Amino acid sequence: MKTITRNHYIQRINQVVNYINNHLNETIAVEKLAQTANLSPFHFCRIFKAITDESPIAFVARLRIETAAQLLRYSSLPIETIAFNIGYETPAALSKAFKLQYGFSPTQYRNDKEKYIVKQETIHPTLTLKVPKIVELAAKKVIYVSQKGAYGMVDYGRAYEQLWGVVKEQKLFTKGIESIGIFHDDPKITDVTLQRADVCLAVHKPAIPVGEVSCRTIAGGLYAVFSYQGSYDQLQAVCDAAMRWVVGSDYELRDEPLFEKYLNDARRTPAEKLKTEIYVPIQSVGR
């Protein structure tokens, strides 16, 4: 695809992905996704696969199974509720799809916290964190560039060049712009080639999507905020520790992705002095 054409389609596919994330509990028809992208169903399927390397049907199916795995590991929701919340008509349908994908049942996975869905060598060592702050956040408007692949290999430099270029072009500069990373997948569950990340700047003026840069809102609500100082290489271990805290707390995960806020400039700061806040969306158990 030519760059201009590809960027145009990226905007449309980003809208579709956001729609899918927000409607996993519903029947998701290809025709509806095509309508969201303002494309014919035939062309939509081809373009979606060209951008994401998956068909729409495969993408939705994978997201449902991986969301189920996350909820089984990190929430106390009954399997029946999980099944209905992510679009399965019956718990048996979820169990069949889960076992077909991973080789064991949802119940076996929930009861054995040592089970890994991806290869164990891809999982980082354990790490201990201080108790987080529990805060109520307002929603944040962000501009972002979506990237796919192993989280440690995300090209932050190129993404931030694009984002700051939009800030300059659209005169979005104000105090309080924040550098944020949104991570949609759990590396224990999703293959490294399919992990999705949004490199973001939180802005305080209305922005217009352009090129590969899209706009979205980070949901407000209750978050557990973990503070970490050190190399970004350890951030996955930090997130793992945050999830262990959730499992042992009086909270459970809310159906939103966690995000990281980067408090200093990695280009000018020694790795051991880099400061990051990890925001984990939570709610009281049984809410």
Question: Locations of the language-model features?
Answer:
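Residue-level marker of regulatory loop/turn positions in helix-turn-helix DNA-binding domains and
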Residues: 5-9, 22, 37, 60
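Short, Lys/Arg-enriched, Trp-marked, Pro/Gly-tolerant hinge/linker segments that flank
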Residues: 1-15, 54-55
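A solvent-exposed interaction/effector surface
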Residues: 18, 42, 47-50, 54, ...
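Hydrophobic, proline/glycine-rich low-complexity stretches
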Residues: 14, 30-31, 37-42, 46
